[in-house]
From Swiss-Prot:
The active site is at residue 86. The lineage of its organism: Eukaryota, Metazoa, Chordata, Craniata, Vertebrata. This is Ubiquitin/ISG15-conjugating enzyme E2 L6. It comes from Mus musculus (Mouse). Keywords: ATP-binding, Nucleotide-binding, Transferase, Ubl conjugation, Ubl conjugation pathway. Interacts with RNF19A, RNF19B and RNF144B. Interacts with FLT3 (tyrosine phosphorylated). Pathway: Protein modification; protein ubiquitination. Transmembrane segments: none annotated. Catalyzes the covalent attachment of ubiquitin or ISG15 to other proteins. Functions in the E6/E6-AP-induced ubiquitination of p53/TP53. Promotes ubiquitination and subsequent proteasomal degradation of FLT3. Gene3D superfamilies: Ubiquitin Conjugating Enzyme.
Length: 153
């Protein structure tokens, strides 16, 4: 119950001052512990479209970290094929109970533009980005145009 109240309060607070890279922030009607939003990266190759993202807060929040998942496919070395995001800030070993959702979303926005090649979950994409950045960008752009969501105006 404590998690639901805190998450509802943080959702309300974030909704009032939505950063420019986020749109359509909402929670499930039946469950405030599940948030949905549209991420609008500002740099290529991902800046051509938008991506739907889901945050799941555990019942033990804030003592356990939320999970982040792209529900729109994205070609990225730190995002598994099922959409789960590998973000050091929300790993069990790095999580701090005072971390706010807006900090997690800011870290996600940075990660999309600047992949963390120290901790990739898709090694083949990290290798391609390291060895042939132009080919990686071309493939990421094609993937973004194929699967990304139209950006709201």
């Amino acid at each position: 119950m404590m998690a639901s109240k805190r998450v509802a309060k943080e959702l309300e607070s974030l909704s009032k001052e939505l950063p420019p890279y986020l749109r359509q922030l909402s929670s499930d009607d039946a469950n405030v512990l599940v948030w949905h939003m549209l991420l609008l990266p500002d740099q290529l190759p991902y800046g051509l479209k938008a991506f739907q993202v889901r945050i799941d807060f555990p019942r033990e929040y804030p003592f356990k970290p939320p999970t982040l998942r792209f529900t729109t496919k994205i070609y990225h070395p730190n995002v598994r094929e099922d959409g789960l995001v590998c973000l050091p800030l929300i790993s069990n070993e790095n999580w701090k109970p005072y971390t706010k959702p807006y900090q997690v979303l800011e870290a996600l926005n940075v990660l999309v533009s600047k992949p963390n090649l120290e901790e990739p979950v898709r090694l083949e994409l990290a290798d391609l980005l390291t060895q042939n950045p132009e080919m990686f960008r071309k493939k990421a752009e094609e993937f973004t145009l194929k699967f990304g969501v139209d950006r709201p105006s």
